[in-house]
Amino acid sequence: NLVKSNGCTAPKCIEKDRARPVRRFLLTEETTDYEKVLALHDWICSYMYYDVDSLASDEAPPYYATDIVKSRKAVCLGFATLMASLCRSIDIPCNVVSGYALGVGNDTAWTDTSIATDEQNHAWNEVYVDGRWMIVDTTWDCANKIENGEMNKGEVSHLYFDANLQFFSNNHKILEYSKRR
């Protein structure tokens, strides 16, 4: 089992040790980097909730890893920021990628307009593991939602974990990378 249960709740651990508790809280010593990233992905997708309510309001969701974990809610940039923060805390390079995704406030087919747009409506990660960059979108793999003030729990998906570029490009377009690896 890659995820430890040591009696410490994630917000207290992360607050106490400034985002370095993943070594003790989430990961075991004997895992590979790929397994560590998978464990982080699965933890984020099972613990966090996509904040549908904040999209409909002017309320800005949290964007700092500690605030995101405390609130247990975020939109895509928060999910990507948290994943990057956790990966970097265990010395795994991770970029936050901004782009355009179909099905996020738009129709679900690429058109000349959406292909040409420089508008950003989504964020995800690229993580460097085993000598290659892999795509990870925890937002789209998380089925937990907060809508109308209610927390609705869903199942964790792996469809967008280590997704191949051809599949990912069906509904995502990269527009900008974070500068820090």
Give the role of each language-model region.
Residues 18, 22-35, 59-65, 82-89, ...:
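A structural boundary/capping signal
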Residues 5, 46, 54-57, 71, ...:
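Generic serine detector
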Residues 78-168:
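Hydrophobic/aromatic-rich core segments of domains that either
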Residues 6-74, 84:
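Secondary-structure boundary elements
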